[in-house]
Amino acid sequence: MTSLFTAAILGIVEGLTEFLPVSSTGHLIITGHLLGFTGEKAASFEVAIQLGAILAVVVLYWSRFWGLLFPKPGQQFSGIRGLYLLFLTSLPASVLGLLAHDFIKQHLFNPYTVAWALGVGAIMILIVEKKETTPSCFTLDEVTPKLALGIGCFQCLALWPGFSRSAATIMGGMLLGAKRKIAAEYSFIAAVPIMFAATGYDMLKSYKLFTMADMPFLAVGFIVSFLSAWAAVKGFIYLLGKLTLRPFAYYRLALAPLVLFFWS
């Protein structure tokens, strides 16, 4: 299918960018073009190694996920209520994603649409940071059904490859009253069910593209993606205590025209 080196590079890119507001899909498309790894099988490989990044979040927030199954006294984001909040957040993008899956795969997975998504997302990040909404939600236990559903609606923006699911949900959370760090942490946790569902759905449709000979490459991509995502999430949460999202917006603005110029 590809070299182990290519699989490792894609795993690093996936893990480092999946939960940052810079678009993992966009970076994977760009990296794939640079490495000469493109096409339907390449796109499915990139989706498959997302499982490594998903697992990293499950490990980092294991106590929260455990609390969803076995509620802890005094925690509001746990048990049936916590699962209900995640359901509300996952619902809008899940429905729209199922309806538009084939269109997105056929028409939006290319450097040009990604470049525009990077630019539009950057401008929106700067607008949200300038707005400086006064937070009303300071912990995960203060997330309300209204906030969860609102974040879910913003998550639909991430169906445009290059926009970034993390950017969409963190911006949405901030606009709707969540503190920046809490918006990010909720974004990470809420990503798990929808990313797992999207990855599973894609693999059900494309598993015939892979053979046993591809397993080493998938394994390398998965493991490297897990390790990179673990480091990226830890670092990002630390930085959010000191920085805004503006540096990520400037990075996106710098990258977008370069992508358009390079592939025009």
From Swiss-Prot:
Further remark: Bacitracin is thought to be involved in the inhibition of peptidoglycan synthesis by sequestering undecaprenyl diphosphate, thereby reducing the pool of lipid carrier available.
Task of the protein: Catalyzes the dephosphorylation of undecaprenyl diphosphate (UPP). Confers resistance to bacitracin.
TM annotation in the entry: 15-37, 42-62, 84-104, 108-128, 143-163, 182-202, 217-237, 243-263
This protein's GO CC annotations: plasma membrane
UniProt subcellular location: Cell inner membrane
Pfam families, per database record: BacA
GO biological process: cell wall organization; peptidoglycan biosynthetic process; regulation of cell shape; response to antibiotic
UniProt-listed Enzyme Commission number(s): 3.6.1.27
Gene this protein is translated from: uppP
Protein name: Undecaprenyl-diphosphatase
Gene Ontology terms, MF aspect: undecaprenyl-diphosphatase activity
Membrane topology per record: Multi-pass membrane protein
Superkingdom per UniProt: Bacteria
Chief site of localization: membrane
Family under the similarity heading: Belongs to the UppP family.
Organismal lineage: Bacteria, Pseudomonadati, Thermodesulfobacteriota, Desulfovibrionia, Desulfovibrionales
Family matches, as InterPro entries: UppP (IPR003824)
Swiss-Prot/TrEMBL keywords: Antibiotic resistance, Cell inner membrane, Cell membrane, Cell shape, Cell wall biogenesis/degradation, Hydrolase, Membrane, Peptidoglycan synthesis, Transmembrane, Transmembrane helix
Catalytic activity: di-trans,octa-cis-undecaprenyl diphosphate + H2O = di-trans,octa-cis-undecaprenyl phosphate + phosphate + H(+)
